[in-house]
């Protein structure tokens, strides 16, 4: 007796199942080959940084991906309990430019305010034009630049003192400025606060202005410590000078060592994410005695062609003309 023949619909269903099975098998083979190839190349099944879309942008430059992968894996393994952030402020947490226009540093916020006379502003601009060129000169060494930075800061601070700026006007000065924090700053600060991660902002700018910027942005959380050049006001609230040792872009090593007590309180926080935008910022973690893993992220904002090689030699990750905190936030997302 002949078995009843299958109707066309049943045949189609069987064919579809068989076809899907073949596709799944082929896809599985392709995936296995991909993983095998990755494993053979890197010694592991996958690379975390290859799976993070933020790392695939053209602005992200990494000289040694294997080293960066190892550091990030160490940071992830250590988790929140071992992490601390050490970061510069001007042009690192704040924007270098927006829609083609330069954004102000903490010093520029004061320089550009309506309380500063036109004559003083002209002198401050002349100082900036002279000394900024020295600061970013790719040929001069840090040691050669050092005395010029002291000259620049000392002269500009002297001019500001002559303006008799009132402390009561700082809030208004910041509110009226064009300062902007980098895209993603809320996520950055809020996530670190939620997980009680210490944030050490080490700035050669003006501390009073810096604090007002992050206060007005709503991100001056209790886990944030600011070390910078703080204004000294007289009993009537008028600027009379600056407190303590001068911090400029190339003496952060000395400043870091002066803050050893702070870092000693965080002796269990042996994993560091460091963010900066200059060669001097690389020394900001010098006060940390027990570093286990440190990831150095550098923003290269200006003179890219001249400085890229030097930055890639010194920073683990270089972000070229990047006005966001996307990369840092993506790493924090993996750790926390």
Curated annotation (Swiss-Prot):
GO terms for biological process: defense response to virus; nucleotide metabolic process; pyrimidine nucleoside metabolic process. Mg(2+) binds at residues 88, 90, 277. N(7)-methyl-GMP binds at residues 135, 156. Substrate binds at residues 203-204, 252. Its EC number is 3.1.3.5, 3.1.3.91. Keywords: Cytoplasm, Disease variant, Endoplasmic reticulum, Hydrolase, Magnesium, Metal-binding, Nucleotide metabolism, Nucleotide-binding, Phosphoprotein, Transferase. The modification Phosphoserine is found at residue 278. The active site is at 88 (nucleophile), 90 (proton donor). Isoforms 1, 3 and 4 are expressed in reticulocytes. Isoform 4 is hardly detectable in bone marrow and fetal liver. It is an enzyme of class 3 (hydrolase). It is found in: Cytoplasm. It catalyses: N(7)-methyl-GMP + H2O = N(7)-methylguanosine + phosphate; CMP + H2O = cytidine + phosphate; a ribonucleoside 5'-phosphate + H2O = a ribonucleoside + phosphate. Induction: Isoform 2 is induced by interferon alpha in Raji cells in association with lupus inclusions. Changing residue 88 to N: Loss of nucleotidase and phosphotransferase activity. CMP binds at residue 135. Its main location: cytoplasm. Changing residue 234 to N: No effect on nucleotidase and phosphotransferase activity. Changing residue 90 to N: Loss of nucleotidase and phosphotransferase activity. Changing residue 229 to S: In P5ND; almost complete loss of catalytic activity. One of its GO terms (molecular function) is 5'-nucleotidase activity. InterPro entries: HAD-like_sf (IPR036412), HAD_sf (IPR023214), Pyrimidine_nucleotidase_eu (IPR006434). It is linked to P5N deficiency: Autosomal recessive condition causing hemolytic anemia characterized by marked basophilic stippling and the accumulation of high concentrations of pyrimidine nucleotides within the erythrocyte. It is implicated in the anemia of lead poisoning and is possibly associated with learning difficulties. Belongs to the pyrimidine 5'-nucleotidase family. Monomer. Nucleotidase which shows specific activity towards cytidine monophosphate (CMP) and 7-methylguanosine monophosphate (m(7)GMP). CMP seems to be the preferred substrate. This is Cytosolic 5'-nucleotidase 3A.
């Amino acid at each position: 007796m002949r078995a009843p023949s299958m109707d066309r619909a049943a045949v189609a269903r069987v064919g579809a199942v068989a076809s899907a099975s073949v596709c799944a098998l082929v896809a599985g083979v392709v995936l296995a080959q991909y993983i095998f190839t990755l494993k053979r190349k890197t010694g592991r099944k996958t690379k975390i940084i290859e799976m993070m879309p933020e790392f695939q942008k053209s602005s992200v430059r990494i000289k040694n991906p294997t080293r960066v992968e190892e550091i990030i894996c160490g940071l992830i393994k250590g988790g929140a309990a071992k992490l601390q952030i050490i970061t510069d402020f001007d042009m690192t947490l704040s924007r270098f430019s927006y829609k083609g226009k330069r954004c102000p540093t903490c010093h520029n916020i004061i320089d550009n305010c309506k309380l500063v006379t036109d004559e003083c502003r002209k002198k401050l601009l002349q100082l900036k034009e002279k000394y900024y060129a020295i600061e970013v000169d790719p040929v001069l060494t840090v040691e050669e630049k050092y005395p010029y930075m002291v000259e620049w800061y000392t002269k500009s601070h002297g001019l500001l003192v002559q303006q008799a700026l009132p402390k009561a006007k700082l809030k208004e000065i910041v509110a009226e400025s064009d300062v902007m924090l980098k895209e993603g700053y809320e996520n950055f600060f809020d996530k670190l606060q939620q997980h009680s991660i210490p944030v050490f902002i080490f700035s050669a700018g003006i501390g009073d202005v810096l604090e007002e910027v992050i206060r007005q942005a709503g991100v001056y959380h209790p886990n944030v410590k600011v070390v910078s050049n703080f204004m000294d006001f007289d009993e009537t609230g008028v600027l009379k000078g600056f407190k303590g040792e001068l911090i400029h872009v190339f003496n952060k090593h000395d400043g870091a060592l002066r803050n050893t007590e702070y870092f000693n309180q965080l002796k269990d926080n042996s994993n560091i994410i460091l963010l900066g935008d200059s060669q001097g910022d690389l020394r900001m973690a010098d006060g940390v005695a027990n570093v286990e893993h440190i990831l150095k992220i550098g923003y290269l904002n200006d003179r890219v062609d001249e400085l890229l090689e030097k930055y890639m030699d010194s920073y683990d990750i270089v972000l070229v003309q990047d006005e966001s905190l996307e990369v840092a936030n993506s790493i924090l997302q993996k750790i926390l």
